[in-house]
Regions:
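Phosphate-binding P-loop
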Residues: 2-8, 71
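Acidic/His-rich, divalent-metal-binding segments that scaffold phosphate/diphosphate chemistry
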Residues: 156-238
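Conserved substrate/cofactor phosphate-moiety recognition/catalytic segment
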Residues: 24-76
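Conserved GTP-binding G-domain of TRAFAC-class P-loop NTPases and closely related GTPase folds
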Residues: 10-15, 20, 28, 113-168
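ATP-dependent NMP and nucleoside kinases share a basic, alpha-helical "lid"
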Residues: 46, 72, 85-125, 135
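Divalent metal-dependent catalytic cores for phosphoryl transfer on phosphate-bearing substrates
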Residues: 206-315
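Short glycine-/polar-rich loops that comprise or flank the Walker A/P-loop
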Residues: 75, 100-105, 146-151
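Short glycine-enriched, charge-decorated loop/helix-capping segments at active-site entrances
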Residues: 50-56, 121-126, 233-238
Length: 316
């Protein structure tokens, strides 16, 4: 799905956790399409003598963006090789190239979480799973169009995925339903099983008049990450930290489960799965916070996201 604008420089921003294969992919793109690659790890190696040293990140990114912007201004296409999993990081990337007429592409890595952790464990400069969870998974948000992208690339969503036979989708869906419908959330905030909660969320959205397939699909799958993030405290109550991010990663690694035959529809479903917990944070936020996200997302997406959050709450 990766395409370039031949009439202007292209700016590709890699988005992915440490160990997801960003650097290999970025270098392959750079070599194949003759693009300059700017790697935060390489700048750390120069400035700090170690790609793992985070102590001088301000200086690292100041120099990186200075050089990257210069290349774009010279009409060269570039790849930014950094994690960029947070909204804050991507908005900074956009701010740093402000005023340059270029084609902006978010390239989202779809490597399964288990593979990421395994790869990291074998690296010379290990990040560690605890740090991956605390510093990267916790801040992961799927790119939103309102950030300024001309294109969002999720390489796992291929024509084969979009043309997935119904029988294959049905098998995947039934296997998932067997897990979620019997999954006791073991939390006083939830009286329904996981599958029943997700189904009720979708029903509530339908009853409000929403007929958008992407949003209803997202509702049916929005808490799927809870299958992989359950922890239990000393009182025997379960918690599901980072479940929205984990669910998004899972769906990107198994996109046939979305059951959608349109690429943009798949992107929209992934957005709502990833952002559904943000709906609650936004609603509890200040007027300034609400204005910020309305400005970023646009009125339609912002309003739909809050409706999604309301349905999620009502379905408990």
């Amino acid at each position: 799905m990766l395409s370039f604008n031949p009439d202007k420089p292209n700016f590709i921003v890699m988005v992915g956790l440490p160990g997801s294969g960003k650097t290999t992919t970025a270098n392959n793109i750079g070599e194949r399409f003759k693009m300059d690659v700017f790697s935060s790890d390489e700048y750390r190696s120069i400035i700090c003598d170690s790609p793992a040293d985070q102590s001088k990140n301000d200086e690292v990114f100041k120099r990186l963006y200075h050089d990257l912007r210069y290349s774009l201004e010279q009409g060269k296409s570039v790849v930014l090789d950094a994690t960029n999993v947070s909204l804050k990081a991507r908005l900074r990337a956009m701010a740093e190239i402000q005023g340059i007429n270029c084609h902006k592409i978010a390239y989202v890595m779809t490597t399964p979480y288990e593979t990421i952790v395994e790869r990291d464990s074998k690296r010379r400069w290990k990040v560690g799973e605890d740090v991956i969870k605390k510093n990267f998974l916790r801040s992961f948000l799927f790119p939103a169009w309102g950030e300024g992208w001309d294109e969002i690339v999720v390489p796992s969503i291929t024509r084969e995925v979009l043309d997935c036979p119904y029988k294959e989708f049905e098998t995947l869906w039934n296997d998932l339903a067997a897990k979620t419908m019997n999954f006791n959330q073991n939390n006083p905030y939830h009286s329904l099983t996981l599958g029943a909660h997700m189904g009720k969320t979708a029903d509530i959205l339908c009853n409000t008049g929403i007929r958008n397939d992407s949003i209803i699909t997202a509702a049916m799958l929005h808490d799927i990450g809870k299958l992989y993030t359950q922890t239990t405290d000393e009182q025997g109550i379960s918690h599901y930290y980072n479940h929205a991010a984990m669910g998004t990663l899972y769906l990107m690694s198994c996109p046939k489960l979305l059951g959608l035959d349109n690429y943009d529809a798949c992107l929209q479903a992934l957005f709502y799965v990833s952002w559904h917990m943000m709906a609650h944070d936004i609603k509890k936020g200040t007027d300034k916070t609400k204005s910020k996200y309305r400005r970023i997302l646009g009125n339609t997406t912002y309003d739909l996201l809050l409706k999604f959050g309301d349905a999620d709450t009502e379905a408990h």
